[in-house]
UniProtKB/Swiss-Prot annotation:
GO terms for cellular component: mitochondrion
InterPro entries tied to this protein: Mito_RNA_Proc_CCM1, Pentatricopeptide_rpt, TPR-like_helical_dom_sf
Keyword annotations: Repeat
Protein name: Pentatricopeptide repeat-containing protein At1g62720
PPR repeats: 68-102, 103-137, 138-172, 173-207, 208-242, 243-277, 278-312, 313-347, 348-378, 380-414, 415-449, 450-484
Keyword Repeat: yes
Domain of life: Eukaryota
Protein family (similarity comment): Belongs to the PPR family. P subfamily.
Species assigned in the record: Arabidopsis thaliana
GO BP: seed germination
Gene3D superfamilies recorded: Tetratricopeptide repeat domain
Length: 485
């Protein structure tokens, strides 16, 4: 009650000030104005929405004398935190038009927003402008530019900027190095990231856990697991404790390469160091085991994570269900699906797609269609492609054609894969003429036949001993620059 009363008073005072205090340069009211805006920011702003922030900004622009740049910066900062970067840039420009000068803080806010919008040329011009007004870029300025360049995959521009700033006496800190190293790793420039790591060491900047995590993940993604393991040992020697992200990155690459004993040793080491494996760690282990057909061990890993108090998520179950279905053990996959529901987890489209495909591959089209009819999540084009292909492969082509006809009438956007499946199904039952009609209609539907379309149709003509048509189509495929499968 007291808080709402304060806000109400502030609101009424605000209206009063805008009506009565628009005259410029009244020395009597300057202290009162400063106290008023200070009180407004301290009592009201935490509950203000975007529209109210804009309204406040407009009132501040109209007030005389003007509030301080600090107060304007608070509004810009709040709007920037809501990710309305273009709006901040517009308001910043409006302040300049109104003759309101900026300080380093407000410049940094707009530079960050420009970088978030990938408007790097303008961001650099703002840096030049602020330097003309006597404001030297600080670590926040440079960090914003570096982060923007890295997010825009312009890592070399980020490195060049650091070099130029060093010439001006700026010393990059661990945050800036981490940003560039992480950006380099994410676009596959792992060697450059390692060179930068060595450079920061030479410059006396101590790497932290974030540095190592980025490098370890980058090395793992590029298949350099031995270098990643060496880096982890280096971490331990420097008393930088690897965290769950570090361990998980290396475990993930070990299991993908089939090095399960090494992965389990690392798992045991992380528990020994009191680093609790999280759902991502277990998901990596389960995924790796499933990739190599070791689904029973993957299921044991699920049981282990539950006993350790780590709750599986939809990804965990989707991975396991997919593993069992690929191993032609679809009933066990369905059992996991039911267990998933008992844990309060709702299967997504991927879950249903996996089970439907599993039943089709097991030669049980009726069970697949039953799962589809009970599907809770919205089917996607992948779902329908699985249905069409499964029906065709199980000699239910007529049902597939009915489904295809319904799909054409619906708002589902069909792709070339969908048409290829239907063309294949028609050819499978000897209905080559209808398949040919569908093939020829592709261009009218805005689709271009791919190598699968051509080879399926050529194969259909060959089965009907229509050699001239198959030969002409083969030549057309070559003219389109497609090589046969």
């Amino acid at each position: 009650m007291r808080r709402s009363t304060t806000i109400s008073i502030a609101s009424k005072a605000n209206k009063f000030l805008n009506l009565c205090l628009l005259q410029k340069g009244n020395p009597v009211i300057v202290p009162f104005i400063s106290r008023f805006w200070g009180r407004t920011f301290s009592t009201k702003r935490s509950s203000m929405n975007l529209e109210e922030e804009i309204d406040l900004f407009c009132k501040m622009i109209q007030s005389r004398p003007l509030p301080s740049i600090v107060d304007f910066s608070k509004v810009l900062s709040k709007i920037a935190k809501s990710k309305n970067y273009d709006l901040v840039i517009s308001l910043f420009h409006h302040m300049e038009v109104c003759g309101i000068g900026h300080d380093l803080y407000s410049y940094n806010i707009v530079i960050n927003c420009l970088c978030r919008c990938s408007r790097f040329v303008i961001a650099l011009s703002v840096v030049g402008k602020m330097m003309k007004f006597g404001y030297e870029p600080d670590v926040v300025t440079v960090s914003s530019l570096i982060n923007g360049f890295c997010q825009g995959n312009r890592v070399f521009d980020a490195i060049d900027l650091v070099s130029k700033m060093e010439e001006m006496g700026f010393r990059p800190d661990v945050v800036i190095y981490n940003t560039i190293i992480d950006g380099s790793c994410k676009i596959g420039l792992v060697n450059d990231a390692v060179e930068l790591f060595d450079r920061m060491e030479r410059d006396g900047v101590r790497a932290d856990a974030v540095t190592y995590n980025s490098l370890v993940a980058g090395l793992c993604c590029s298949g350099r697991w031995s270098d990643a393991a060496r880096l982890m040992r280096d971490m331990v020697m420097r008393d930088i404790v690897p965290n769950v992200i570090t361990f998980t990155a290396v475990i993930d690459v070990f299991v993908k390469e089939g090095k399960f004993s090494e992965a389990m040793k690392l798992y045991e080491e992380m528990t020994r160091r009191c680093v609790d494996p999280d759902v991502f760690t277990y998901n990596s282990l389960i995924n790796g085991l499933c990739m190599h057909g070791r689904v029973d061990e993957a299921k044991q890993m699920l049981d282990l994570m539950v006993t350790k108090g780590c709750l599986p998520d939809v990804v965990t179950y989707n991975t396991l269900i997919n593993g069992f279905c690929k191993s032609k053990r679809v009933d066990e996959g369905t059992k996991l699906f039911r267990e998933m529901a008992q844990r309060g987890l709702v299967g997504d489209t991927i879950t249903y797609n996996t089970i439907i495909q599993g039943y089709f591959q097991a030669g049980r089209p009726d069970a697949a269609q039953e799962i589809f009819s009970r599907m809770d999540s919205r089917p996607n084009i992948r779902t329908y492609s699985i249905l069409l292909y499964g029906l065709c492969m199980n000699w239910r082509v007529e049902k597939a054609l009915v489904l295809f006809e319904n799909m054409q009438k619906s708002e589902i956007e069909l792709d070339i894969t969908t048409y290829n499946i239907v063309i294949h199904g028609m050819c499978k039952i000897g209905n080559v003429e209808d398949a040919w009609d569908l093939f020829r209609s592709l261009s009218c539907k805005g689709l271009k036949p791919d190598v699968v379309s051509y080879t399926t149709m050529i194969s259909g003509f060959c089965r009907k001993r229509q050699w001239d048509k198959s030969d002409l189509l083969y030549r057309k495929m070559q003219e389109d620059g497609l090589l046969p499968l």
